[in-house]
Amino acid sequence: FPIPLPFCWLCRTLIKRIQAVVPKGVLLKAVAQVCHVVPLPVGGICQCLAERYIVICLNMLLDRTLPQLVCGLVLRCSS
C-alpha cells in the first residue's frame, strides 16, 4: 500500500536538506580514498575514473535521482 503524500513530501525534503549540508567535495574525497585502498593496477584505473566521471555521476544522482529513489524504495512513494 502506498504511503500518504505528506510523508513522501517530507522524505524528499529531508533528503534534499541533507544534500545541501554535505558538500560534494567531501564525497569526492571519500571516493578517492576508496581508490587508494584497492590494489595498484585497479587503483590507478579507479582514480582515473573517479576524477573523470564521479562529478558527473554525483551531480546526476544527488540533484535528481536520490530523493525520489530513496523515498520510493523506503516509503514506496511514487515519483
From Swiss-Prot:
Alphabetical list of InterPro entries matching this protein: Saposin-like, SaposinB_dom
Keywords annotated in UniProt: Disulfide bond, Gaseous exchange, Secreted, Surface film
SMART domains: SapB
Secreted in keyword set: yes
Disulfide bonds, paired cysteine numbers: C8-C77, C11-C71, C35-C46
Location of the Saposin B-type domain: 4-79
GO terms for cellular component: extracellular region
Domain of life (superkingdom): Eukaryota
Location within or outside the cell: Secreted, Extracellular space, Surface film
UniProt xrefs under PROSITE patterns: SAP_B (PS50015)
GO BP: respiratory gaseous exchange by respiratory system
Function noted in UniProt: Pulmonary surfactant-associated proteins promote alveolar stability by lowering the surface tension at the air-liquid interface in the peripheral air spaces. SP-B increases the collapse pressure of palmitic acid to nearly 70 millinewtons per meter.
Other comments on record: Pulmonary surfactant consists of 90% lipid and 10% protein. There are 4 surfactant-associated proteins: 2 collagenous, carbohydrate-binding glycoproteins (SP-A and SP-D) and 2 small hydrophobic proteins (SP-B and SP-C).
Subunit and interaction comment: Homodimer; disulfide-linked.
Record's protein name: Pulmonary surfactant-associated protein B
Annotated organism of origin: Sus scrofa (Pig)
